Amino acid sequence: DERAKELLECLWVKFYNQPAPVKVGITLKESATYTDFANINTGGVTPDGRDGVNAVSYLILDCMDEMKLVQPNSNVTISKKTPARFLKRACEISRKGWGQPAFYNTEAQTMELINAGKSLEDARRGGSSGCVETGAWGSEAYILTGYLNIPKVFQLTLYNGFDKESGKQLGLK
């Protein structure tokens, strides 16, 4: 458990150190302190509807509590099947007042995704992403940070993965 927790904490540090463009203009004025939309969701249900809380879920809660980093956004997804012990631990962390974890309702998210045309299995596989959006992971693209360099993708496509700026082969031939 300690080794797994250490690896999770290293992941938290990687997320926190993600290079992001400096916020300028209206973004700086209105939301200079927002995170860059990386979300860790834990809890919820499995695609077949069983409780999704497991040993890693508790390690993630411990990581949230010990690291106290604003990124990644740390979320717990609560369903009717969520163990009371898990919910209590998440509430203990939340009451410390540093803004995490966020709490989401599994059933509400699932219904939102079904209403958007997703299958029940895909809807159960989804969760929160971005600010507070709900997405069905694995069945749709979610690029919320705005840091996808589409012109670079186009350039690499045109030149068979070769990057003319660096002189390196970065993509597929």
Residue ranges of predicted features:
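Conserved catalytic cores of very large enzyme subunits
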Residues: 1-173
